[in-house]
Amino acid sequence: MTKAIATIVLLIATIINISCDNSTIYNKYINADTRGWGKNEVMEYTIDSIAQTGTYNLTLGLRINNTYPFQNLNMLISQTIYPKNITYTDTITCRVTDRQGKMNGYGVTLYQYSMPAATMEYTKGDSIKVRVIHNMKREVLPGIVDI
């Protein structure tokens, strides 16, 4: 009986170790203004130096509360790679709610969203500056807590 339990525990531990992904090189949220995210409020993130040449996935995370008034959130994301001084820009749309107004994110009063933004090749020593702005018609978006 104890041998069977030990085998199950070992199997679960192995699965957990295999599924863990330790490749995150940068993770940061910036708080939006308490009134909401302003159209001219640029969220800027700087990655000082890439340690290893390779392919990296850029993922954008959001935290939104239930006062956000729209179904979607459109954002412009640009990343400048130094020392090459090359800038890539893309538009990302986050589907915040379904058609009935139910939040699609994870959470109870604060909803978490995670969206793939880009897959990029970086060279060892590159530094990256990522800028995110919202691309909605409304000047200030209430309900946006962190980006």
Residue ranges and their predicted role:
Residues 52-60, 120-137:
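Noncatalytic modules at the cell exterior or secretory-pathway interfaces
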Residues 21-24:
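Bacterial signal peptide processing site
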